[in-house]
């Protein structure tokens, strides 16, 4: 942030015109009345006047926040890190991120969006614009400030990551203009992926239950035995804490299908197929040690109808695939000890131990 504290105001003075005012006004109209919206990486406030009120101006640079506050004193000003938002669950009604998340490393963006999903209310609009392309580093040609980190994105991969983070991308909104890619999305009543580089194992459920979606973590029902089995297997250290499971132990989590339902029986064959393709792209990108599918229904629907629990002959995204029985309390045929054994073996396949 020293770069922005030292040179940010000079850059802001030459970029004071809000070139996307109509998009900002359209975003403001989509935020529910009286709901708080947040300008992520507000800088000197180029778009803040057009986002509606009440508004949070959020930036990591105190110098930029001071300049913004002097021009627009009616907003709430918060200094912080876009990857660690200091807000409570469901407290924000909309998020505007214009050329902000492009400063987050590609393999860390899923968790930054997981945190954004956490603080946004269900149905909250989210608009994001980032750099288009494959560049990642701090020596971008044309960087007028100099020394800033940038991460470019292909449109299809950005759409996958946003969808995986629990957002419904609006049809036709994913677009490229010059060297920029942008999209509009809505925070869904579902779970966000907890994924990143260096995963020993990626756990893939069938789809979130409404109970888990509202709780903010997978396998959240008291009768579900996933977390007791994972703790007993020694692959996590905290109960029902997917972020800690990833960051402290290398266990990521996603789902075949992002749509939350009361029961997995509501998931359609087309949803399984679409979801499998998304998970395969995710695995090919992040290359976890292994992928453990919890519940056989998705794998049997898409890959092999006669599949049995255990290490599969087929890989996914070039990585080993392990399929295990459902951990639901309704699956009385499989004991906690058996579930623990499956998780331990899948973990070993992924290189854990």
Residue ranges of each PLM-predicted region?
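Class I SAM-dependent methyltransferase SAM/SAH-binding core
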Residues: 38, 43-84
């Amino acid at each position: 942030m020293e770069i922005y504290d030292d040179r940010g105001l000079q850059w802001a003075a030459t970029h004071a015109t809000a070139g996307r005012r109509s998009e900002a006004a359209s975003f403001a109209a989509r935020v529910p009345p009286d709901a708080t919206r947040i300008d992520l990486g507000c800088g000197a406030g180029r778009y803040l006047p057009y986002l509606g009120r009440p508004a949070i101006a959020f930036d990591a640079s105190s110098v930029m926040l001071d300049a913004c506050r002097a021009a627009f004193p009616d907003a709430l000003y918060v200094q912080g890190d876009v990857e660690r938002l200091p807000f409570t669950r469901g407290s924000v009604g909309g998020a505007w991120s214009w050329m902000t998340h492009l400063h987050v490393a590609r393999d860390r963006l899923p968790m930054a969006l997981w945190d954004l999903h956490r603080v946004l209310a269900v149905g909250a609009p989210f608009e994001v614009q980032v750099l288009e392309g494959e560049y990642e580093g701090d020596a971008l040609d044309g960087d007028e400030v100099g020394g800033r980190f940038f991460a470019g994105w292909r449109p299809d991969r950005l759409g996958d990551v946003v969808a995986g983070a629990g957002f419904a991308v609006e049809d036709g909104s994913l677009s490229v203009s010059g060297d920029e890619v942008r999209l509009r999305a809505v925070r869904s009543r579902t779970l966000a992926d907890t994924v990143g580089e260096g995963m020993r194992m990626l756990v893939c459920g069938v789809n979130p239950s409404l109970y888990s979606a509202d709780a903010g973590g997978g396998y959240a029902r008291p009768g579900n035995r996933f977390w007791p089995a994972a703790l007993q297997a020694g692959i996590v250290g905290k109960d029902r804490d997917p972020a800690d499971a990833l960051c402290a132990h290398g266990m990521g989590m996603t789902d075949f299908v992002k749509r939350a339902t009361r029961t997995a029986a509501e998931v359609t064959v087309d949803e399984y197929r679409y979801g499998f393709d998304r998970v395969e792209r995710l695995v090919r990108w992040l290359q976890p040690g292994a992928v453990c599918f919890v519940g056989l229904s998705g794998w049997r629907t898409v890959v092999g109808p006669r599949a049995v629990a255990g290490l599969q002959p087929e890989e996914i995204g070039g990585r080993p695939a392990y399929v295990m029985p459902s951990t639901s309390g309704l699956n009385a045929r499989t004991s906690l000890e058996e579930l623990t054994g499956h998780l331990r073996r899948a973990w070993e396949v992924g290189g854990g131990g």
